[in-house]
Swiss-Prot record:
Compartments it resides in: Virion; Host nucleus
The organism of origin for this protein: Alcelaphine herpesvirus 1 (strain C500) (AlHV-1)
Cellular component GO terms, alphabetical: host cell nucleus; viral capsid
Family, as annotated: Belongs to the herpesviridae TRX1 protein family.
This protein's encoding gene: TRX1
Keywords: Capsid protein, Host nucleus, Virion
HAMAP family xrefs: HSV_TRX1 (MF_04018)
Name listed for the protein in its UniProt record: Triplex capsid protein 1
Subunit and partners: Interacts with TRX2, MCP and capsid vertex component 2/CVC2.
Gene Ontology MF term list: DNA binding
């Protein structure tokens, strides 16, 4: 006959077992206090018994411990050889032109210097860039034939609908037929492999420091903080009987609204001249220029100028360190 177990007996048994186990001393850990090496080794062994292997790797994504902590974004382009000169400095801005007839796998990239040569700007416009462009690319370079329907796009002031800013140059692998061009499209300016810092490099002829060039107080512009933004403008100017596009880069620590006012003041004479010359009132060609944001940097960092000597010619460039690439699309300012 099976006896019925009293719940109180089980409760008393559990209590007795718990009290009995409390009388047993805990397991001791041998840690030497006499020798520093022995203490550290014993402490490491003790912690290792209760830690999980690879916990650090499982909690953090790969590369989280490598500078920069905000990872930059890179993109590779395939371009025809000799359309991006091997002399182009690292850190120069890049622009991509979309051709309807170009193979999808082949890109059309321009730097400010190759763009100057491709659109055929005269020598009196940015003379130093003009001289270097013809030395690096030549008068019969392939860059002059890369943009189809250029004249039509310029007549209607619509080149910016096909020309898009993409980033800054990181690497240009030169070859006989195709070049692989690596661009930093967004993020802090670092090399993709060496994690070495990059600088934004702009030909000095194409660079304007708005805060130093114009009397900003006359326009009521106020500093926006400790960050300076670099902008790029593409304007449609009249050179004789032709319309030519020109790139210019501006730096300012003012707000976007104030920068828009300052850029309009900078181009005031050219804007007025285009409106006076456009006697036919062609609404498609009334646009004077567009602008975009290239990125930003700390206002406390100074701007450096240096001379690049290549093939017996020198080019004065402006370099901006500690730069964060943050391109935006074009927007019409006049």
């Amino acid at each position: 006959m099976k006896t019925k177990q009293d719940p109180r007996d089980q409760k008393n048994y559990d209590s007795l077992q718990s009290n009995l186990f409390r009388l047993i001393p805990p397991t001791t850990h041998k840690i030497s206090l006499a020798r520093p090496n022995g203490f550290l080794r014993g402490l490491a062994d003790l912690v290792g018994k209760y830690s999980v292997d690879g916990a650090e790797e499982s909690l953090f994504q790969p590369g989280a411990w490598d500078a920069p902590y905000v990872q930059p974004a890179f993109f590779d382009f395939l371009v025809h050889a000799k359309t991006i000169s091997k002399h182009e400095p690292v850190g120069v801005p890049l622009f991509c032109f979309k051709n309807n007839s170009t193979a999808p796998s082949i890109d059309v990239l321009f730097t400010p210097i190759s763009f100057h040569a491709a659109v055929g700007l005269p020598a009196d416009v940015d003379p130093n860039v003009h001289r270097v462009a013809h030395i690096w690319y030549g008068d019969d370079s392939e860059v002059s034939s890369l943009m189809e329907d250029l004249n039509i796009l310029l007549e209607e002031s619509n080149l910016h609908t096909r020309l898009h800013p993409v980033g800054i140059l990181v690497e240009n692998n030169d070859s006989s037929f195709l070049n692989r061009v690596t661009a930093l499209t967004h993020g802090p300016a670092y090399m993709s492999r060496k994690q070495a810092a990059l600088k934004l490099v702009i030909p000095t002829d194409l660079f304007v420091d708005l805060d130093a060039r114009l009397n900003v107080e006359a326009y009521g512009a106020q500093p926006s903080g400790g960050t300076s933004t670099v902008f790029c403008t593409l304007v449609y100017t009249r050179c004789g009987n032709d319309i030519k596009p020109a790139l210019t880069f501006f730096k300012s620590n003012k707000s976007d609204f104030d920068v828009l006012t300052l850029i309009r003041a900078y181009y005031a004479d050219l804007i007025t001249n285009k409106l006076e010359v456009n006697q036919q009132c062609n609404i498609n060609g009334l646009k004077f220029g567009v602008m975009c944001t290239v990125g930003y940097t700390d206002s406390s960092h100074s701007i450096n100028q240096q001379s690049l000597c290549i093939r017996g010619s020198s080019l004065l460039v402006t370099s901006i360190s500690n730069f964060f690439v943050n391109y935006t699309g074009w927007r019409v300012f006049a």
